[in-house]
Amino acid sequence: MKKTKVVCVGEALIDRIRNKSNEGFTDFLGGAPANVACALSKLKIDSTFIGRLGSDDYGKKFITQFNKLDVNLDFLQVNNDSSTRVVNVDRDKFGDRFFSGFELSLIHI
């Protein structure tokens, strides 16, 4: 039987989620492609992540997590001149999520 291999391309970013008390935030490793690569690896499916991280502490945390889960990083780019993207996640009065922090995203392209 052939082993399944999946390539996940896109963002790895920090989800900065507002605490329920509305006082402060908690940071989580996020970004759908990064999350999928990690989840597949936990399911024993070979996964590769292709994306770009900053060389900051958040970027290092991603690399540590990817390595811990044996996600292939052969095509990962690490940018020494920028930081890993952080996105703020808030909830409106109905509990729906909304995101901010993409305003400067073109700087990272």
Question: Where do the model's predicted regions map?
Answer:
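Positively charged, low-complexity intrinsically disordered leader regions
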Residues: M1-N19
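Residue-level detector of alpha-helical segments with a strong bias toward transmembrane helices
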Residues: K20-S21, S41
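Short pre-catalytic strand/loop immediately N-terminal to key active-site residues, enriched for Gly-Thr
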Residues: S21-G30
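Conserved donor sugar-nucleotide recognition element shared by glycan-biosynthetic enzymes
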Residues: L29-V36, Y58
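Alpha-helix C-terminal capping segments
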Residues: N35-D46
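Conserved N-terminal subdomain of the carbohydrate kinase-like
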Residues: D46-I107
